[in-house]
Amino acid sequence: MNRNTKNEKKLISNGEEFDRLLKEKDAIFVLFSNDSCGYCQIAEKNINQVIGDFPQLELYQLKLTDAPEIFERYGINSVPVSKVFKDGKAVYTGFGVRSPNDIYYQLQSYFGSGNSYFKDLANNN
C-alpha cells in the first residue's frame, strides 16, 4: 500500500479559504467532516491509503463548524462526504466510507493510473 506521506491533509479554516483553493488549485480532494464523526476517521484512513498515488491531488479537510455555508452550498447533510474538485468544479462525490479500492478506481478515471497494488485491483475489475 502506498501511504500518503508526501501529501498530508491540510485543514480548511473557513469558506473564504475553500473558495480561494478552488480558484488557485488545479485539483483538490476535500473530506467534509465534523469532530464527533468516527466514520470520518475511517474515511480519512482509506483516502490516505490511495491519495499518495495521485500527486496532482492535494488532500484537505473541511469541518462543518468551520464553514457551514459550504456544506449548505453542496447540499451536504451528513458526513463523511468526499469531493474531488478539478478546475474549480466537483467531478466526484463519495458518500460515507468508501473502500480504498473504490476511491482509487474513481480517481484513476480522472487522473490516470497511479503506482500501487490498487492499480492491479482496479484493472482486474
Question: What would you call each of these model-derived segments?
Answer:
Residues 1-28, 108-125:
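N-terminal leader/targeting and pre-domain segments
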Residues 9-13, 32, 55-69:
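Thiol-based oxidoreductase modules, predominantly thioredoxin-like and allied folds used
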Residues 33-36, 78:
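Short pre-active-site segment immediately N-terminal to redox-active cysteine/selenocysteine motifs
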Residues 83-124:
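Non-catalytic, surface beta->alpha helical segment in thiol-disulfide oxidoreductase systems
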